[in-house]
Amino acid sequence: MNTKAGILGVGSYLPEQSYDNFHFEKIMDTSDEWISTRTGIKERRFAKESEATSDLASKAALKAIECAKLNVEDIELIILATITPDMSLPSTACIVQDAIGAVNATAFDISAACSGFVYGVTIAKQFVETGCYKNVLVIGAETCSKFLNYDDRTTAVLFGDGAGAAVIGPVNEGGILSTHMGSDGKGKDCLKVPAGGSRLKASKETVEANLHTIEMAGSDVFKFAVRKMAETSLRALEKANLNTTDIDYLVPHQANIRIIQASSKRLELDMKKVYVNIDKYGNMSAASIPVALDEAYREGKIKKGDNVVLVGFGGGLTWGASVVKWTL
């Protein structure tokens, strides 16, 4: 009998510090009305100076493991999706492994920006279904606030910090029915942090020029996102032999309310079936989908047997969707 992978548990963690749009009115040329009408964002959470991505990730991880009714020692693999790691070396996943005491786990990071969690779920599915690992912890965690340029009002107001996690393991029925992913490196300059890597190493000049902060070509990303969010959802549904009328709930990447609305319209999906929390947290990159998934589950929006679509897009450019028959 073939092993089928599914979601065994979910969890999330948000930093305590919350900043509304009026905070940004005081430090840059913007307004609550401008931010709200263009993005749907009202507030976002920022980590403390002393908090790193691994701190947020560890707390979300422990909640997901508890939800799955497992012990930390049961985790055999940790996949952590992030674009804001604690440091270049070692991987943030290894730091989390040590922090939570997952002594039996292999650990590595992946970098696919806002698509990272879906990429992680896809990788975990293969490992579980081929029998390589039984219980895989997938985490999406970010501290984007530490990589913002407050001279760039179009980008600085968008991002927030947080972490979400899911335990992927064998299920008797349902589970992860299909996934679809894609990448287009021609769009590499649409979303980037230019300095700090081997292309442009850190220096006094790069720091002074704000080249260690997130840069985004907003209009290009918007057009790409609306097209790809719907397209990749349809591809994943097709692989699962389902269509849009079979969707019980959509959990999209929370980047912009207009992108979410436009994508849902293309899928002919009522917004009542779409989870939205961008107003509370802004764009949390790889943490966006797992945080939304955890909240949707705990609020009773997702029920056992539901067909749930997780879909995201991000820098790279990258995109991905997973169709999950909910088993919790």
Curated annotation (Swiss-Prot):
How is this protein named in the record? Beta-ketoacyl-[acyl-carrier-protein] synthase III
Name the residues annotated as catalytic in the UniProt entry: 114, 253, 283
CDD domains with a match to the protein in the record: KAS_III (cd00830)
The organism of origin for this protein = Clostridioides difficile (strain 630) (Peptoclostridium difficile)
Question: Where are the membrane-spanning stretches?
Answer: none
UniProt-listed Enzyme Commission number(s):
2.3.1.180
Identify the PANTHER family for this entry: 3-OXOACYL-[ACYL-CARRIER-PROTEIN] SYNTHASE, BETA-KETOACYL-[ACYL-CARRIER-PROTEIN] SYNTHASE III, CHLOROPLASTIC
Q: What class of enzyme is it?
A: transferase
Q: Which InterPro entries match?
A: ACP_syn_III_C, ACP_syn_III_N, FabH, Thiolase-like
